[in-house]
Design a protein with these regions (language model features):
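Outer-membrane beta-barrel translocator domains and adjoining extracellular loop/strand segments
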Residues: 27, 40, 56, 64-72, ...
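Residues on the lipid-exposed face of transmembrane beta-strands in outer-membrane beta-barrel proteins
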Residues: 39-43, 83-89, 127-133, 179-183, ...
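Transmembrane beta-strands of outer-membrane beta-barrel pores
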Residues: 59-63, 103-109, 135-137, 146-152, ...
C-alpha cells in the first residue's frame, strides 16, 4: 500500500529548527492530492481444477505539500501499482480456497528542508493460499503467505541539496502462517480460537529515517541493520446470542521476536527530541468484551444499547514497558432509528496510562462523549443522501492520546459541532 507521511493535523504548531531561528515562520499547513485508478477482471473455469479467477489492478498517486506560512516546505510523493491475481479452486470435499499472487511497486520521494526519509523504491512480490473447511459445527481457516521485499535507496543522505551519499539495498523474505477455528456449540453459543506466526519486513521509515519529522514534532533516526520482526499470536474467544441480548469476549497474546519500535534517546537535534528506531523481543497480552441489547421496536423507534471494554499491556524483554501503549477503556453507547432518522450516542472512559517507557510521560484519563443525528434519503439509480449533525467531545475534555508523541504538545480537538451532507451514488 501507499506510505503516507505527515498527513496528520498540524494545527498552528510553530516550526522550531535552530537553523531558522532568526526568522519567524508562519503556521504549518498541508495540501494533499490522491488519485486512484482501479480495474478488475473476473471469469469462470480458467484452468482445470479451478472454478474462478480474479485479476485486480490498482494504481495510486499520492502527493502532499507542507507549507510554512505561504512558503513551500517539503513535498512528499508516493506512486504505487498493485496487481493481485486470485484463483479459486474447485471444492476439495468440505474445503474451499484460493491461491494467489500479488506484486506491488512503490516509489517514494521527499524533497525539501523537512525531508526525513531518502527517496526509495520498494518492490514486494508475494504468493499466498487461503483455505476454509466447513464440518457441521466446526469451521476451520488456514492461510500461508510468502513475500520477497526489495528496497532500493539510490542516496541514503537525506539532504535538500549537497553531496550524494552511498546507495543501499535491503532484501527481506517474510513468511506467515495461520490456523483458526469456530466451534458453533449451539445457535446461542460459539467458541473461537486461532494461532498464527507472522513475519514483517522493516519499513522504509524504520530503516532509513534521518531528520526532523514535522508532523510528529520529533527527529527520527532509523537503523539500516534492523532485521525481520516476527510474532506468534494466540487468541481465544466466545460469543453468546440469546436473541435480543448478544455478547462476545476475546483474549489474546502476542510474543514478538525483534519487535520494532521507536524509543526516546533523551537527546535533542534541531530543537526536537531524537527518537531512534530499535528492536528487541516483546510480549503483549490483551482482552476485549462487547455486549449489546436490542429492544423491541415501538412507536418511539428502534433502540439498541451496547457497551465494550478493552485492555492491552506490552513489555519489552528488558522488563520495561513498550512505548505509546493505549489505555484501558470502557464504553457505553445507544443506537436509535425510526423511519429515515438515525441517531447514536457514545461515551468512552479512558483510564490513566501510567505504564510508560523510559522518558515517556504519564497520560491522564479522560471521558469522551460523542453524538450524531442524521436524516437519510434515496433517489433513483442507487442515489443516496444523508444530512447529519454531529457533536464531538461534548464534555470539552482535554484529551491526550497516549499512543502519540504529540500528546504533550497537542491535545485532541475540544468541543466541536459538525453539520454536513453526504451523497452516495
Amino acid at each position: 500500500g501507499d506510505e503516507e507521511h505527515g498527513d496528520e493535523e498540524h494545527g498552528d504548531e510553530e516550526h522550531s529548527d535552530e537553523e531558522h531561528s532568526e526568522e519567524e515562520e508562519g503556521p504549518v499547513t498541508i495540501r494533499l492530492r490522491t488519485e486512484r485508478t482501479e480495474a478488475e477482471v473476473a471469469g469462470s473455469n480458467p484452468l482445470p481444477g479451478f472454478e474462478q479467477f480474479k485479476v485486480r489492478f490498482v494504481d495510486t498517486s499520492y502527493k502532499h505539500t507542507e507549507f510554512e506560512g505561504d512558503e513551500v516546505g517539503t513535498v512528499f510523493e508516493s506512486d504505487s501499482t498493485n496487481t493481485r491475481v486470485e484463483l479459486k479452486h474447485n471444492s476439495w470435499g468440505a474445503w474451499q480456497g484460493v491461491f494467489g499472487f500479488q506484486y506491488t511497486d512503490l516509489d517514494f520521494s521527499a524533497v525539501g528542508a523537512e525531508a526525513f526519509i531518502p527517496n526509495t523504491n520498494t518492490k514486494t512480490t508475494a504468493a499466498f493460499w487461503i483455505e476454509r473447511g466447513d464440518f457441521d459445527a466446526w469451521q476451520i481457516d488456514l492461510g500461508l503467505r510468502y513475500e520477497d521485499v526489495k528496497i532500493k535507496v539510490p542516496n541514503t543522505l537525506v539532504l535538500e541539496e549537497g553531496p550524494t551519499g552511498p546507495s543501499s539495498d535491503s532484501d527481506f523474505q517474510p513468511f506467515s502462517a495461520s490456523a483458526g477455528t469456530i466451534w458453533t456449540i449451539s445457535d446461542a453459543v460459539g467458541l473461537t480460537g486461532s494461532v498464527s506466526y507472522a513475519e514483517r519486513a522493516p519499513g522504509v521509515e524504520e530503516l532509513y529515517a534521518n531528520g526532523p519529522h514535522i508532523a510528529t514534532q520529533v527527529f527520527e533516526v532509523g537503523d539500516v541493520s534492523l532485521s525481520k520482526e516476527s510474532t506468534v499470536h494466540v487468541e481465544g474467544g466466545a460469543r453468546l446470542d440469546l436473541g435480543r441480548f448478544s455478547g462476545s469476549a476475546t483474549v489474546y497474546m502476542d510474543q514478538f521476536s525483534d519487535y520494532i519500535y521507536q524509543s526516546d534517546s533523551g537527546l535533542e537535534e534541531e530543537g526536537l527530541p531524537v527518537l531512534v528506531w530499535s528492536q528487541q523481543n516483546a510480549d503483549f497480552v490483551g482482552a476485549e468484551v462487547e455486549l449489546r441489547y436490542d429492544f423491541e421496536e415501538s412507536k418511539f423507534g428502534h433502540w439498541q444499547v451496547f457497551s465494550f471494554a478493552d485492555v492491552v499491556d506490552g513489555e519489552l524483554s528488558d522488563n520495561t514497558d513498550v512505548p505509546l501503549m493505549p489505555p484501558k477503556r470502557v464504553a457505553l453507547g445507544l443506537d436509535w432509528d425510526k423511519g429515515n432518522w438515525t441517531a447514536n450516542v457514545l461515551w468512552i472512559h479512558a483510564y490513566d496510562q501510567n505504564n510508560v517507557a523510559e522518558l515517556e510521560t504519564d497520560t491522564p484519563g479522560y471521558d469522551l462523549l460523542n453524538a450524531e443525528l442524521a436524516l437519510n434519503g434515496s433517489g433513483q439509480d442507487q442515489f443516496e443522501w444523508q444530512i447529519y449533525l454531529k457533536g464531538q467531545n461534548l464534555l470539552d475534555e482535554s484529551i491526550r492520546n497516549s499512543t502519540s508523541y504529540l500528546k504533550d504538545q497537542a491535545p485532541q480537538i475540544g468541543l466541536n459541532i459538525i453539520f454536513g451532507v453526504r451523497v452516495f451514488f
